[in-house]
């Protein structure tokens, strides 16, 4: 039974995990003609996809100008559970489509003409032409011209031209040719000829444009003196042979550069697929709308692959819902798909493919082509940053050799010392010259090696880049790259997995790790007995016990060993026949010997026996090692001011609650703790996310200020490089403690699929090999440091000895001298009292005993006096004289019998 249950659970979990992201993605397609080149390009692009998930098309052929039919087909595909719809629209159906997409949260990817809409669920593949057209008109200095347009494309381009005309005093004649017949064309150009209007802008789709040009040729309005600007992105798709022969000047725009590597490779695959799949389609050269269709399929593929890598669940469960329900029920996963589509960036058939937050193309390049009687040539290019760049300037900058050099790139960065800082006199400079710092110089070196021009822009929200867990949107510099507002990020941007899924990184230009910043603790004042610090308290206790133990062992060994006993030398005149044995190592002498040896001073006595000398030898060896070790450490402990840090590691932070700690609110450090599976870091993350007040800060500067003002009650977790830099800045009151918690690196970021990735990567490697990266770090970290050499790196500072360092030694000296005086006084008092008691007892001896003693003392001494009891031996065999002390001779003793002093007897 347990095995069955385990098998069931395993199968269930597998089903759930597998359902998180489908292997097959249904996508819709709305095409006006099954035999169109766009339809063939759609199929061809699907056949080129190899990475999962697999895109399965649901294609409907529809009249794109019929609102009812478009509504029916759109709702039909939505009910089938498609994840996104690719298709075309016209002026009559565009509003209906955008309304449905916004209400149902279904993404619609289209190569049709751009429309001005705030609906973020409509992704417009075709670049806008308004600004490019105005730049070309301005380049030719046209003041009076005719604007022929097709109302089916909308009026956005015309409106922008008329607004500019009002600003620049242009004379513009606008003509709508939506319903113009052949006779109408004839009358139109006859009227223009009368007014001598020979400068004409034609704004039409390719099919209608070919018809208009045919009428121009038929009416012979294509001779010398006529100049036509074609507001169309497919200049090479149009047959202009008649114009070339007659001498008219024709200028236009070309979106697809067929000589580039990627279009050339795809074109080769395009041609080889002709004979197998789509024999009735002209494959000589795809139209720009077909190229947009191909890129549109790749946009969807890239988006779903990104969602799959990020493990975002977009599975459609149950019924897809009613398209015409009132109110409309939006699809829950639609917003995730919409964000993924907008974040896509790659080099496709139409160049750099990326979108802004409104779903419109951005950072694209249009090639400006001109045809005269001598042939077709490229006269320049246009992009959003540089506007129109003539071919001469293009050639000076390197021509068409590299697409990297064709525009000014936006380099996003963040104000963070010492990476990017405003100069003190920044208001006196413009552009990139306003900034200084490590990353400013690095960006300049990268641009010099790659060979492109750039403009530094500070990220508006002041964040590095993190993904909002609710909206799934990216902020900071990562968001700038993801949403196409910047081309490169040169900043202290950490390389992480979640960021690598949406942007590309170069090789690391700096290695680092997460570290702990705390307020530098006050230097501990040396204690009175700091000379005891070289040895631990336990060692001092062991030394005391060893001293006592050695003294006791020496005393016992000396008592037991017969070789420690010896005869005392007698005074001259004494009887030397008596041999009394003595031992110099009593308990006090043993203590004195051990103390003298420990102090390396010695004493007047030494062991005589082998056992005693063994005890003395091992004690001398012990004291030699202890004293040498103590002396070696004493200098360092007395001359170094030490700082006691309350925190030394992440473990210390995790196991206490008195000191708060936090990270940057949006950054890789916070993401590291959130994703970590290490017990210590999980515990720290649990504390940080639930701490009140919040321990997270918006900027590194805010974290630094909080550390300084919290009086040691807040620790800030940040990258080690920034920690080391702040430690070198005044007021020099922060410090880095412990080692790094992880190992990672800073990298230069580019959008996914950017052409800059490889050149930038090679430039970083070259700068590293040249040693320039190390030079830059030394320059901005240490050469410009404000805390002195090593001032911020060392927790200890060597200085001269002061009285406070050795005060304890003087205290012990003074105490010892005082103790000696006190003991001497006690000894004197004790001896005086003892003598007084002894003399008092002597004076009370009976008169007869005194007389007898006197008589005895007058007798001549003989050799047997000592043996007969007239003398005695004292301690250690010394003979005690029986004569009265001199002091006693002057003491008046009273006789018991007569009451007279002894001195009065005349004795």
From Swiss-Prot:
Gene3D superfamilies named among the record's database cross-references: 1.10.287.70, 3.40.50.2300, Periplasmic binding protein-like II
Residue ranges annotated as Extracellular topological domain: 19-536, 631-805
Post-translational modification: Phosphorylated at Ser-645. Phosphorylated at Ser-710 by PKC. Phosphorylated at Ser-849 by PKC, PKA and CAMK2. Phosphorylated at Ser-863 by PKC, PKA and PRKG2. Phosphorylation of Ser-863 is reduced by induction of long-term depression and increased by induction of long-term potentiation. Palmitoylated. Depalmitoylated by CPT1C and upon L-glutamate stimulation. ZDHHC3/GODZ specifically palmitoylates Cys-603, which leads to Golgi retention and decreased cell surface expression. In contrast, Cys-829 palmitoylation does not affect cell surface expression but regulates stimulation-dependent endocytosis.
Lipidation (S-palmitoyl cysteine): 603, 829
Membrane-related topology note: Multi-pass membrane protein
Keywords noted in UniProt: Cell membrane, Cell projection, Disulfide bond, Endoplasmic reticulum, Endosome, Glycoprotein, Ion channel, Ion transport, Ligand-gated ion channel, Lipoprotein, Membrane, Palmitate, Phosphoprotein, Postsynaptic cell membrane, Receptor, Signal, Synapse, Transmembrane, Transmembrane helix, Transport
Motif PDZ-binding: positions: 904-907
UniProt family annotation: Belongs to the glutamate-gated ion channel (TC 1.A.10.1) family. GRIA1 subfamily.
Assembly mode: Homotetramer or heterotetramer of pore-forming glutamate receptor subunits; heteromeric assembly can be the result of both receptor subtype and flip-flop forms and according the composition, one partner can be dominant with respect to the fast desensitizing current component, whereas the other can determine the steady-state component. Tetramers may be formed by the dimerization of dimers. Found in a complex with GRIA2, GRIA3, GRIA4, CNIH2, CNIH3, CACNG2, CACNG3, CACNG4, CACNG5, CACNG7 and CACNG8. Interacts with HIP1 and RASGRF2. Interacts with SYNDIG1 and GRIA2.
Miscellaneous notes: The postsynaptic actions of L-glutamate are mediated by a variety of receptors that are named according to their selective agonists. This receptor binds AMPA (quisqualate) > L-glutamate > kainate.
Protein name per Swiss-Prot or TrEMBL: Glutamate receptor 1
Native source organism of the sequence: Rattus norvegicus (Rat)
């Amino acid at each position: 039974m347990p095995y069955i249950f385990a098998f069931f659970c395993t199968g269930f979990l597998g089903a759930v995990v597998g359902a998180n992201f489908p292997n097959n993605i249904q996508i819709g397609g709305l095409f006006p003609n099954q035999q169109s080149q766009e339809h063939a390009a759609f199929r061809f692009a699907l056949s080129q996809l190899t990475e999962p998930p697999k895109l399965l098309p649901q294609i409907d052929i529809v009249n794109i100008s019929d609102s009812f039919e478009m509504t029916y087909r759109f709702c039909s595909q939505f009910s089938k559970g498609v994840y996104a719809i690719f298709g075309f629209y016209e002026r009559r159906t565009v509003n209906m489509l955008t309304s449905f997409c916004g209400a149902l949260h279904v993404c619609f990817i289209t190569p049709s003409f751009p429309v001005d809409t705030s609906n973020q669920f409509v992704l417009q593949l075709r670049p806008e032409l308004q600004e490019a057209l105005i730049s070309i008109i301005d380049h030719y200095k046209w003041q009076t011209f005719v604007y022929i347009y097709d109302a089916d494309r909308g009026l956005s381009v015309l409106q922008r031209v008329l607004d500019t005309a009002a600003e620049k005093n242009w004379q513009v004649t606008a003509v709508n040719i939506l319903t113009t017949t052949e006779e109408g064309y004839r009358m139109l150009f006859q009227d223009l000829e009368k007014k001598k209007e020979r400068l004409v802008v034609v704004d039409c789709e390719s099919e209608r444009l070919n018809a208009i040009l045919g009428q121009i040729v038929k009416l012979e309005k294509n001779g010398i003196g006529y100049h036509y600007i074609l507001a169309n992105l497919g200049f090479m798709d149009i047959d202009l042979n008649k114009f070339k022969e007659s001498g008219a000047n024709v200028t236009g725009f070309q979106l697809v550069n067929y000589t580039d590597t990627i279009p050339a490779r795809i074109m080769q695959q395009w041609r080889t697929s002709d004979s197998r799949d789509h024999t009735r389609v002209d494959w000589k050269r795809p139209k720009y709308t077909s190229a947009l269709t191909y890129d549109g399929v790749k946009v969807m593929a890239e988006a779903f692959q990104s969602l799959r890598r990020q493990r975002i669940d977009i599975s459609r469960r149950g019924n897809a819902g009613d398209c015409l329900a009132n109110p409309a029920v939006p699809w829950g996963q639609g917003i995730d798909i919409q964000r993924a589509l907008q974040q896509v960036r790659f080099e496709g058939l139409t160049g750099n493919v990326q979108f802004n937050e409104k779903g419109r193309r951005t950072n694209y390049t249009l090639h400006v082509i001109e045809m005269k009687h001598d042939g077709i040539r490229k006269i320049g290019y246009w992009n959003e940053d540089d506007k129109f760049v003539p071919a001469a300037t293009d050639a000076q900058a390197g021509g068409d050799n590299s697409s990297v050099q064709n525009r000014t790139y936006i380099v996003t960065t963040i104000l963070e010392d010492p990476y990017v800082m405003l100069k003190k006199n920044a208001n006196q400079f413009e552009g990139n010259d306003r900034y200084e710092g490590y990353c400013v110089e690095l960006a300049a070196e990268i641009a010099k090696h790659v060979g492109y021009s750039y403009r530094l822009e500070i990220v508006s929200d002041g964040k590095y880049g993190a993904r909002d867990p609710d909206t799934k949107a990216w902020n900071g510099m990562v968001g700038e790259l993801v949403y196409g507002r910047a081309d490169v990020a040169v900043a202290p941007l950490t390389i992480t997995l979640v960021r690598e899924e949406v942007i590309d990184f170069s090789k690391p230009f700096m290695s680092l790790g997460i570290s702990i910043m705390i307020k530098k603790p006050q230097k501990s004042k040396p204690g009175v007995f700091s000379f005891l610090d070289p040895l631990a308290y336990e060692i001092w206790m062991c030394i005391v016990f060893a001293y006592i133990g050695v003294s006791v062992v020496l005393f016992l060994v000396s008592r037991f060993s017969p070789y420690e006993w010896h005869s005392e030398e007698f005074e001259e005149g004494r009887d030397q026949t008596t041999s009394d044995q003595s031992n110099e190592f009593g308990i006090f002498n043993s203590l004195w010997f051990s103390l003298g040896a420990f102090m390396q001073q010695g004493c007047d006595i030494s062991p005589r026996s082998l056992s005693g000398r063994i005890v003395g030898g091992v004690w001398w060896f012990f004291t030699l090692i202890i004293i040498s070790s103590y002396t070696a450490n004493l200098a360092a402990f007395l001359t170094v001011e030490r700082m006691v840090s309350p925190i030394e590691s992440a473990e210390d932070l995790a196991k206490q609650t008195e000191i708060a700690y936090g990270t940057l609110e949006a950054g890789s450090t916070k993401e590291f703790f959130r994703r970590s599976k290490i017990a210590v870091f999980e515990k720290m993350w649990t504390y940080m996310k639930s701490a009140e007040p919040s321990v997270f800060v918006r900027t590194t500067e805010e974290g630094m200020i909080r550390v300084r003002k919290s009086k040691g009650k807040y620790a800030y977790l940040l990258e080690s490089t920034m920690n080391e830099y702040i430690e070198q800045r005044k007021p020099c009151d922060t410090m880095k403690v412990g080692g790094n918690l992880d190992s990672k690196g800073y990298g230069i970021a580019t959008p996914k699929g950017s052409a800059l990735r490889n050149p930038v990567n090679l430039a970083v490697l070259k700068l590293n090999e040249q040693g320039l990266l190390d030079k830059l770090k030394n320059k901005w970290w240490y050469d410009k440091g404000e805390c002195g050499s090593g001032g911020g790196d060392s927790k200890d500072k060597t200085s001269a000895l002061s009285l406070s360092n050795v005060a304890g030694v003087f205290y012990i000296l003074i105490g010892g001298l005082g103790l000696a005086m006190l003991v001497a006084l006690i000894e004197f008092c004790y001896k005086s009292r003892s003598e007084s008691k002894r003399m008092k007892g002597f004076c009370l001896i009976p008169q007869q005993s005194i007389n007898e003693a006197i008589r005895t003392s007058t007798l001549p001494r003989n050799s047997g006096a000592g043996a007969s009891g007239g003398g005695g031996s004292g301690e250690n065999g010394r003979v005690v004289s029986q004569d009265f002390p001199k002091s006693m001779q002057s003491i008046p003793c009273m006789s018991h019998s007569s009451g007279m002093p002894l001195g009065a007897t005349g004795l």
